[in-house]
């Protein structure tokens, strides 16, 4: 299978075996509690153009959807394994850009016993106290685990390890595949070893297609799980057909289809026999509601029905 060959070809990230053990323990502990667990993938991958990489082809994604969704899943009682691009949006923290902290926080007094106390006006970081409390509660309960990736190779190895960790949970596991994964890569055997120099003239690169990892995920790594993929398009005339084609090819449960122009306010939940449009009203937007709240609410209901159908 081309997908498995690619995972074997690409070098694993440093600490891959350790992370596989950590994820397996996380899933087993929450599974023993009877808790559902969701893997949320978030952010974009990048592929190196040289073996000693200086240049990369990067799939940009802020990771905001994955981070916001992770928060809603935690609030709904799920354990969340958050596989995210380093330095992309992080649950709770993404609402507060670092530059706002510099003007909002100030020392409240001299440091004592190695501790620094900070204070801020309540309106300087609106919502910060509640976000901090939610994050710390999840950390204390052991229901949140964050694992970083950077390159395509990192992502594929860690995705496989995460899937194998969640596989024993059967239908109680959900995969929420919101990461923007590279479509092209250069095989290791075809990479130049050193930095590509501009003195050589215009650059021509031949890249191979990255096989879709939905196939081994559905068939081999976690065949009993509830699997959700995402489809982003710019043409409304083709988006539903492309979502349905993905369901037919990979045989998973749900595609969340969204158009670039309305990505933060509207999606369509597509299954093999239904289409459900989720839309934020102007009032909901004014109140600060995010579309991920509606997405997760819908998927949680579908996941419940999926579990009941399997038992």
Regions found by a protein language model. Give the residues of each.
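A cross-family phosphate/adenosyl-ligand binding-site feature
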Residues: 1-311
């Amino acid at each position: 299978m081309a997908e498995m060959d690619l995972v074997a070809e690409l070098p694993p990230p440093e600490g891959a075996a350790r992370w596989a053990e950590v994820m397996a323990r996380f899933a087993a502990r929450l599974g023993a509690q009877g808790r559902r667990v969701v893997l949320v993938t978030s952010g974009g991958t990048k592929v190196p153009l040289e073996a000693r990489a200086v240049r990369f082809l990067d799939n940009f994604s802020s990771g905001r959807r994955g981070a916001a969704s992770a928060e809603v899943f935690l609030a709904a009682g799920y354990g969340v394994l958050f596989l995210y691009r380093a330095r992309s949006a992080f649950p709770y923290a993404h609402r507060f850009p670092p530059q706002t902290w510099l003007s909002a926080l100030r020392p409240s007094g001299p440091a004592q016993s190695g501790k620094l106390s900070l204070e801020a006006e309540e309106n300087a970081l609106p919502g910060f106290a509640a976000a901090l409390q939610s994050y710390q509660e999840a950390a204390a309960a052991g229901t949140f685990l964050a694992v970083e990736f950077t390159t395509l190779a990192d992502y594929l190895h860690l995705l496989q390890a995460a899937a194998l960790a969640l596989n024993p949970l059967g239908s109680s596991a959900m995969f929420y595949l919101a990461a923007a994964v590279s479509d092209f890569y250069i095989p290791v055997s075809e990479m130049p070893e050193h930095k590509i120099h501009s003195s050589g003239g215009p650059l021509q690169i031949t890249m191979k297609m990255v096989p879709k990892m939905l196939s081994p995920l559905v068939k081999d790594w976690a065949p009993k799980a509830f699997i959700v993929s995402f489809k982003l398009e710019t043409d409304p005339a083709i988006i539903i057909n492309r979502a349905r084609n993905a369901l037919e090819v990979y045989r998973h449960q749900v595609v969340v289809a969204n158009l670039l122009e309305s990505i933060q306010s509207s999606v369509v939940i597509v299954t093999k026999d239904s289409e459900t449009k989720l839309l934020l009203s102007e009032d909901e937007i004014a109140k600060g509601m995010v579309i991920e709240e509606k997405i997760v609410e819908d998927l949680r209901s579908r996941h419940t029905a999926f579990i009941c159908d399997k038992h």
